[in-house]
């Protein structure tokens, strides 16, 4: 389950490791928020995101 509350509030904070604003990831260490690169439907569980995107190898 995705802990991100973006769909409800537009913002989320995932255990301190991930912060979203307006449903876009601003800082992220885990794939708890939609910070995948364009064309990537979701990042693999436990994927480390760098900046606003994760590595394409994390795509699933």
Swiss-Prot record:
Q: Where is this region: Alpha?
A: 29-60
Q: Does the keyword Membrane apply?
A: no
What taxonomic lineage is listed for the species of origin?
Eukaryota, Metazoa, Chordata, Craniata, Vertebrata
From the UniProt record, report the name of the gene that encodes this protein: mt
Protein name in UniProt: Metallothionein
Q: Which organism is it from?
A: Pleuronectes platessa (European plaice)
* Residues where a divalent metal cation 7 binds: 49, 54, 58-59
Identify the residues that bind a divalent metal cation 4: 32-33, 43, 47
Record keywords:
Acetylation, Copper, Metal-binding, Metal-thiolate cluster
The function of this protein is:
Metallothioneins have a high content of cysteine residues that bind various heavy metals.
UniProt free text on domains: Class I metallothioneins contain 2 metal-binding domains: four divalent ions are chelated within cluster A of the alpha domain and are coordinated via cysteinyl thiolate bridges to 11 cysteine ligands. Cluster B, the corresponding region within the beta domain, can ligate three divalent ions to 9 cysteines.
